[in-house]
A protein has these predicted regions:
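Short, well-ordered beta-strand elements within core beta-sheets of diverse protein domains
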Residues: 40-50, 119, 166, 235-243, ...
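A helix-coil-helix interface module used to build multimeric assemblies
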Residues: 1-201, 206-212, 274-275, 286, ...
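Generic, well-ordered alpha-helical scaffold segments in large soluble proteins
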Residues: 40, 61, 65-68, 90, ...
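Charged, flexible cofactor/metal-binding loops and thiol motifs
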Residues: 121, 143, 151, 157-311, ...
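Glycine-rich cofactor/substrate-binding loops
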Residues: 1-36, 97-98, 279-435
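A local structural micro-motif
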Residues: 52-53, 150, 183, 220, ...
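Short runs of predominantly hydrophobic/aromatic residues within well-ordered alpha helices
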Residues: 37, 84, 88, 234-237, ...
């Protein structure tokens, strides 16, 4: 079945059909397409545009088609042009001429626009639920190792002592912002484009507010050209997906390092690790590595759709068929990563003794040593210089600030006293900072 066959004297070449078809991508929206058609048909009947009898046939037929697809009794035709064509054709074959009235006052342009918004509205709920699950796993891990002291880095150089819970807390804050981005995008997306027609609305006395309300939208898009040509919501969601995946990638990078023999800060559960086909000793953090790699894929989806949209004149263009490949892949990838990583993190074991031992080196309490002098009245820049000289002395003598005798401290600055050892104790350092 072709919805546009009347004007043409030749059948489309098979290569044209194959290239033009989007059924492999948009078939997942069959539920949303049926929901949109039910709302549209009900409105048409309410406005007297189609008869109540035809509307009843349409609604019953659409309900049967939905049930048959879900049960597997009806298979979606892989040769159909798109899901809209397939469902309308199937409906007409079942109920006759009444099915031909369904598309009155509607274009596939506004039909697909409403379908994808309905589908993504549900998908966003799935993603936010998964993000909350990852936050819960991270929060549980932070509480489990709340007082575990570890190295804090800047420039990947040892910087200051921190707690594991503070470190993980940073990722929790990132994920909370991610939640906000998805929620904000979903709110802007929740306007109905149905009734926009091909681009210029329709001459039929339709009720756009009625269909918007029936489909759970907050209202409808006032400009019909924008209604069919807007894909900002896809770009916004892909932007949210990309930022989320950047955060996930950063977390995974650290987990990968922590699980290495060089760090030995953490160990993943066997159920969430893999091995090598040739090296018997290997225990690889493949889930974390795959998630890190998939960040590039999602960012690519965003860049691809941005590039597709950047040169399109108003209103609808067939280029926009690429939107679903990008947004579905981005959202699917995010859900896959969140689903895999949450139990991996929940079962991950930290090794506090190794983390504490590593924190003892690298003079990460030097700032606290300088702050001790400031507490004695020395200007910070002078305290900074004196502490730098102490660090140089320790490096020369192969010792640490904790091991350096008080006489050596006093040789650099007479304001030092025995209290400096309490000041540079790592546990005291993190406590004073409220970590």
């Amino acid at each position: 079945m072709k919805l546009w066959a009347g004007r043409f004297s030749k059948e489309a070449d098979k290569k044209t059909n194959d290239f033009n078809s989007s059924i492999k991508t948009d078939s997942r929206m069959f539920n949303e397409d049926i929901d949109g058609s039910i709302a549209h048909a009900s409105m048409l009947a309410a406005k007297g545009i189609i008869s109540g009898e035809d509307c009843e046939k349409i609604l019953a037929g659409l309900s049967d088609i939905r049930n048959d697809i879900i049960s597997g009794e009806l298979m979606i035709d892989p040769d159909a042009e798109d899901i809209h064509t397939f469902i309308e054709g199937e409906l007409t074959s079942r109920i006759g001429d009444a099915g031909k009235r369904l598309h009155t006052g509607r274009s596939r342009n506004d039909q697909v626009a409403v379908d994808i918004r309905l589908y993504l509205r549900k998908d966003v709920q799935s993603v936010t639920k998964l993000i909350n699950g990852l936050i819960a796993a991270l929060d549980g891990k932070a509480k489990e190792y709340a007082r575990c002291i570890m190295l804090g880095y800047t420039h990947l150089q040892r910087a200051q002592p921190i707690t594991f819970s503070a470190h993980i807390g940073a990722y929790i804050e990132m994920l909370r912002r991610d939640l906000g981005r998805f929620e904000d995008a979903a709110e802007r997306m929740n306007l109905s484009p149905l009734g926009s027609g091909a681009l210029a609305g329709t001459t039929y006395p339709i009720d756009r507010a009625m269909t918007a309300k029936a489909l759970g939208f907050d209202g409808y898009m006032p400009n019909t050209l924008d209604g069919v040509s807007d894909r900002d919501f896809c770009l916004e969601l892909l932007g949210a997906c990309s930022i989320l995946m950047v955060h996930i990638s950063r977390l995974c990078e650290e987990i990968i390092m922590w699980c290495s023999w060089e760090f030995k800060f953490a160990e993943l559960d066997d159920a969430f690790s893999t091995g090598s086909s040739i090296m018997p000793q290997k225990k690889n953090p493949d889930l974390a590595e795959l998630a890190r790699g998939k960040a590039g894929r999602v960012i690519g989806d965003l860049c691809g759709l941005l590039t597709t949209m950047k040169g399109l004149p108003l209103a609808y263009n067939k280029d926009m068929q690429e939107d679903k490949d990008a947004i579905f892949d981005g959202m699917d990838t995010v859900k896959m990563c969140l689903t895999a990583l949450t139990p991996m993190i929940a079962t991950m074991k930290m090794i506090p003794e190794n983390m504490r031992k590593a924190a003892a080196g690298g003079f990460i309490n030097a700032t606290d040593c300088a702050d001790f002098l400031v507490s004695k009245g020395l200007p910070f820049r002078d305290a900074y210089k004196a502490t730098g000289e102490l660090v140089a002395l320790c490096i020369k003598n192969g010792t640490t600030l904790e091991e350096l005798p008080i006489d050596e401290y006093k040789s650099i600055c007479p304001l030092f006293d025995e209290g400096v050892y309490d000041a540079i104790n790592l546990e005291n350092c993190v406590t004073r900072r409220g970590m």
